[in-house]
Amino acid sequence: MEEPKTSKNENHEPKKNIICEESKAVKIISNQTLKPRNDKSEIGTSSLNRNSSKKTKQNDICIEKTEAKSCKVNAASVPGPKDLGLVHRDQSHCKMKKLPNSPMKAQKGSSQTKLEKTPSLQTKAEKVPKSPNLPVKAEKAPCTTAEATTEKALNSQRKEENTPTSQMKLQKTPRSPLEPENVPSLLLKENVKQTESQQTGKKLTSSFVSMDKRKSEALQGEKSALENSSLSQKQQTQTDNIADSDDSASGIEDTADDLSKMKSEESNKENSSEMDYLENATVIDESALTPEQRLGLKQAEERLERDHIFRLEKRSPEYTNCRYLCKLCLIHIENIQGAHKHIKEKRHKKNILEKQEESELRSLPSPSSAHLAALSVAVVELAKEQGITDDDLRIRQDIVEEMSKVIMTFLPECSLRLYGSSLTKFALKSSDVNIDIKFPPKMNHPDLLIQVLGILKKSALYIDVESDFHAKVPVVVCKDRKSALLCRVSAGNDMACLTTDLLAALGKVEPVFTPLVLAFRYWAKLCYIDSQTDGGIPSYCFALMVMFFLQQRKPPLLPCLLGSWIEGFDPKRMDDFQLKGIVEEKFVKWEYNSSSATEKNLIADENKAKADEPKDDTKKTETDNQSNAAKAKHGKSPLTLEAPNQVPLGQLWLELLKFYTLDFALEEYVICVRIQDILTRENKNWPKRRIAIEDPFSVKRNVARSLNSQLVYEYVVERFRAAYRYFACPQKKGGNKSTMDPKKKEKGKLSSKKPVKSDCSATNCCILGESAEKIHMERGQPAKHDETEFTSQRCIVDNDSLLVNELGLANHGQDSSSLSTASGGSDLKQKSAEKQGDLTPSETSLKKELSQCICIGTPDGAESAGTDCRSNLEMDSSHQIVCNNVSATSCNCKATEVTSDLVDEDNLPSQELYYVFDKFILTSGKPPTIVCSICKKDGHSKNDCPEDFRKIDLKPLPPMTNRFREILDLVCKRCFDELSPPCSEQHNREQILIGLEKFIQKEYDEKARLCLFGSSKNGFGFRDSDLDICMTLEGHENAEKLNCKEIIENLAKILKRHPGLRNILPITTAKVPIVKFEHRRSGLEGDISLYNTLAQHNTRMLATYAAIDPRVQYLGYTMKVFAKRCDIGDASRGSLSSYAYILMVLYFLQQRKPPVIPVLQEIFDGKQIPQRMVDGWNAFFFDKTEELKKRLPSLGKNTESLGELWLGLLRFYTEEFDFKEYVISIRQKKLLTTFEKQWTSKCIAIEDPFDLNHNLGAGVSRKMTNFIMKAFINGRKLFGTPFYPLIGREAEYFFDSRVLTDGELAPNDRCCRVCGKIGHYMKDCPKRKRLKKKDSEEEKEGNEEEKDSRDLLDSRDLRCFICGDAGHVRRECPEVKMARQRNSSVAAAQLVRNLVNAQQVAGSAQQQSDQSIRTRQSSECSDSPSYSPQPQPFPQNSPQPSALPPPPSQPGSQPKLGPPQQGGQPPHQVQMPLYNFPQSPPAHYSPMHSMGLLPMHPLQIPAPSWPIHGPMLHSAPGSTPSNIGLNDPSIIFAQPAARPMAIPSPSHDGHWPRTVAPNSLVNNGAVGNSEPRFRGLNPPIPWEHAPRHFPLVPASWPYGLHQNFMHQGNPRFQPKPFYAQADRCATRRCRERCPHPPRGNVSE
């Protein structure tokens, strides 16, 4: 089965040239196993399966790819795929691969001679598009004996179609009379187009046989059917090709004479010959079938035709293997078994029911005068009952006047006005009162509404005063105490007031407008589709829909607001004409404002038109006049027609429902009341989804965008159909109950059992044979209502129209294009169908058939159904549709007799007809579909959303105990003690900065100045925190006159020359362009930004806060640890940054009662805040900490402990602080609302203290917000419930990520799949670009010496296994060069031997225990530099290598290590500190290992195939490591090496239970979430010989953590374990301070 292309594709658009592109994918349904065969008769000498992909799918859909040249097809006579006639393709110019089998007896003898391929065509066989049959395994659908016989016949026919190749060598395909020999293909196409346009009528007459005619021909007998088929084929051939055998003989002679000409024009003749085959070759040659086979084929196809599946008379040029077409689903089907399978698909069933329902509605009889009168009465009565009166309007106006007096007392410059439905009189009695406040420009909109909120709360005239500032239109909601009416007060809503004035003026000049809108609004209210907050449509949109209908109906009742009467008006530039308001209550004022964007688009269109069209002076003059038009800059348009039409109100109501139910394509067009032309979605650049309504005064956005759910849209469409069905059928008075007497009822039953007329086509008649009563009873609904609803409908024979809804198939989510049948008055549907190529000239006969539908309602449909044939269409509701030899989808039924009681019903007087707006009738008893605006799920509103963390019920916490308080204090203190960098590290960071500054000044610009900011200086940095560097240039105060992007790019090129840096990456697309780098020796990452001076002041202020009270730093570190443990501390991956969490801590301490810290930005002398302008912002804060106690005597009153403050922080953000209403702002003590900042759309609002427009939570999604708040809620419970873990297990208990995050991973749906960061897609990932980029210039600069040996290699193919960097090999690695320089005393041969041979490291006699142990070397003291990380281990079954002897004369050489220790850990040994942040591990490791949160276990070390400096840890006994050579795949394809870090580290465990990268465990199991440190297998040179670096901070609080403490990550990732070096203490003083004992013999 093959699906044709969509309407946008040219293949199905009439009168367009089709270009068959290469490699088209075609879907085919086949239910039999197709064997590969060489169908020579179809493609000459080419095999069908030569290019077969040989892929098989379980759903029996195989995809073919045709790879060949493009062929141009003229489709002037090609009907659309949605046409109900048979598919008919162009007959002259499409390339095909089939050779004919003659269906005509008269030409049987000459068929082969006439149509076989020539040798030249055989030589080009592979250039022709091929559509081979692919072998497909499929389940055979159940079929009858006749169908099985038919398939045997078809198989035999396939064999007969095979033509020997030898018979095709000396024959030529005859030329079509439409195709001259010497005419080029383009000219030929034009000639053929003209000729075919003249022959269209003949072709349609001969090929498109009506359904009734084909049915009658089928009943005449086999012989006559075959003769008719032969005649039809013969007529077609005579019209398009050559008519007799003489022409064929002359064609053969021409082949011998014109062989050279044919070779020169081979492509044209190839097209003609293949197209001739398509014109002459039928899909199924019935002449080759036996009478039994023909009968079986006929019966099977009659069965398929009932389900809109028809045999193709001609093979489709695109789907050559398909014989049938489902005209309901527009699917090409290969055989009968495939057709039966397609019938059972949900898509086909859904389309059947939709087709049935649409046909029902279109076939409803025209309303009588009594019917229209009853409708008019119902609408008028509804308007009187539900609409507001003049007295109601006066009450609402009085409310506005009273409120105006109250508000103007405090705000005299403001004024109030009434707008909305109250002013237009479209309001229902329960509608709100909409009030708008006009205010001067100097006032702020948020401040005004906040003041109004306070004023109304103090007033005694109003109750229930609340704010709804998070709505699309922020309002203050209150209730008038006297009238109990709900009031909504907005401010500055000018556009809504203008629209209100327009609708109010229309209600005054057009009397039918107001009752229609009231009825429409009340219907929407009953169906609950007017609730904007629950995914419905705004109520005033229904007034615009009524206005649009009155403009589009024929004849119209209302004029459009803009049109051709305006001088120079152009619909393409309609946005240049802006509506300004109502004038004189009869006109709308407009102004012309030229739009540059519109002009550019228009100029582009004009240029394109000039290029495509020939030059014409007349057209040029018209274009000039049009472009120079619109001389009038303003004007006015009338609101009424000069000669208004008088139409009954009931007729308008019925037409309104029909217009939006059947005529207007809601998903295709825009409801626009400004112009008469239909506005498409493309004109507005709006997506084709659901409903689009344009406000005439606010034209940029779709006002119906609140309907953002497909479920709600389908519910709305269903309600439209139900309403039209109800009001279009006559309803009796008295509760809609049938008044038929039993005799007449029985007579109706008997009469309905009579057979239908013989001229009723079997493909167009349907009887649904299951009563609605039975369905209702099965669903448990009362039978009384079933009888009421059923008898009130006048529908197709025996069918209640509610059956479609009850079957439950109308809401299937599968998208499929339904076949729209055009009705007489459906102009918009016709336009859409013509645009999509859906309808062909055969639609005329279809309309005629549909117009003959007579719908007769009978009380009991079950008894009236015939039982001659039953169709077991499977439906979801397990009901069966009983067919009486007729279609299950059509409504073209003609009954032989109509019961007298139903005929009399048409003549009932208007008093007997009665209509009521009843909720149960209009909704069919179905509840409304509600979609949450927060999570976009149905079934609940946003107020009941389960994903809203504010709805979580927090259980009260037990009281705090002293012992538990002490434990919390200790946990918070240790976070600071173990993670804060020592002074030596600060010194090393400054040295790195100085070195970089000197290098940049020397290589780039001597005026460059660098300074540190961020975590390195603000007092909250970790030991491995990044280096945040700001670069400035002397002579430039700011970067206004600098090209920052160019400077950053040039700086990156310069830094790539720095031998001590790696991984240089410029990021110029960020808000602040930066250059990222990594320092090789320390492993620290950093970034350099330009003129980020405001961040420097932020750094100073945070450092000042940290210096005020030590508890500030303690809590800041605890918060950062908490965020990292829960994987919620990385802004680049969609969460909050560590800076944001520090601001949260400071805000909590400021709001604490009594406060712990003051608000530094509010401490100043005088009344005016001092100005310290930086980058346009005031960066002032009070920085004299020594004077704070004098100014604020109450500063030290808060004496809470760390544990109490930490728990109070968790409780503050989970219990007290409202993230929806307030902003976290440390610049003021007063609460700052999100409405004031206009950040109501953000889930978390954290204001930068200086850059007031910067919201640090702007990038946090709702999913991430819920995840963050869930961690805080779980942390509140964990830290607030007293529990006493084992000594040494406190951190494992309190920072268990599985408990804090409920075992879930942080949302990463917004992250790039390559780098894990947000802000770009995978295709734009800088890491991906960097891997693919070819830096040829840098390659030449860095590798000039070895250029000749690598001329043919790409830089991406080169990777050093020492450092892991791409672009060079091992011998060029700068680390190897540095190693040679450092180890000058080591002989060259020794170095080569160390790099190549596997060696074993000698160890001391002590054995290493299960717990990882860190010792210092004899040459180190407490301030000695740290080790460098060791390479990743190899499989443990490798033999233990030999030791690497140290250089004998080098003073800094490292001693040998003894063998690993055995047994348990000695009592005097101390485990690793909890938060000691040491060396960052290798790839996919995180610095959080050093927190002690990862398991520490002894690991074995493989033989070093690279230079190793310093001692190494040994594995436990029992393992036999093997030698590893340089050719080992684990080396060649290894991850980049470890990131060196100048901080001591314990050895890390490589035996993870689920083999996950340890950094993924640190970051809550999300693999690759933290910044991966790709460094290759081998570490860089350590800092043994460098100046003093980061010392080990002795820890007195040991923690031994279980390896399952961390959250496990993706098991698919296979990490390489990491090994750290062991250190040894050199002196007694060092050993006393070091918690680890020395190993080996150490001299005192």
From Swiss-Prot:
SUPFAM superfamilies: Nucleotidyltransferase, PAP/OAS1 substrate-binding domain, Retrovirus zinc finger-like domains. Interacts with LIN28A in the presence of pre-let-7 RNA. Interacts with T2BP. Interacts with MOV10; the interaction is RNA-dependent. Ubiquitously expressed. One of its GO terms (molecular function) is uridylyltransferase activity. It holds the Pfam family zf-CCHC. Residues 1428-1450 have a biased composition (Pro residues). Its main location: nucleus. This is Terminal uridylyltransferase 4. Residues 918-1634 are annotated as: Sufficient for monouridylation activity. Its EC number is 2.7.7.52. Belongs to the DNA polymerase type-B-like family. Changing D1028A: Loss of nucleotidyltransferase activity and oocytes are unable to support early embryonic development. GO terms for biological process: interleukin-6-mediated signaling pathway; miRNA catabolic process; miRNA metabolic process; oocyte maturation; polyuridylation-dependent mRNA catabolic process; positive regulation of interleukin-6 production; pre-miRNA processing; regulation of lipopolysaccharide-mediated signaling pathway. Residues 273-353 are annotated as: Required for interaction with LIN28A and pre-let-7 RNA. Disruption phenotype: Double conditional knockouts that have deleted both TUT4 and TUT7 at the secondary oocyte stage are infertile. Females ovulate normal numbers of oocytes with normal morphology of antral follicles but with a slight decrease in the frequency of surrounded nucleolus state oocytes. Mutant oocytes are unable to support early embryonic development, they fail to complete meiosis I properly. Residues 108-123, 146-156, 163-174, 194-209, 226-242 have a biased composition (Polar residues). PANTHER family: POLY A POLYMERASE CID PAP -RELATED (PTHR12271), TERMINAL URIDYLYLTRANSFERASE 4 (PTHR12271:SF49). Disulfide bonds: none annotated. Its cofactor is Mg(2+); Mn(2+). It comes from Mus musculus (Mouse). A zinc finger (CCHC-type) spans 930-947, 1310-1327, 1358-1375. Residues 745-755 have a biased composition (Basic residues). Residues 649-698, 1201-1254 form the PAP-associated domain. Residues 30-60, 75-277, 603-640, 733-759, 812-841, 1329-1350, 1402-1483 are annotated as: Disordered. Residues 258-272, 603-623, 828-837 have a biased composition (Basic and acidic residues).
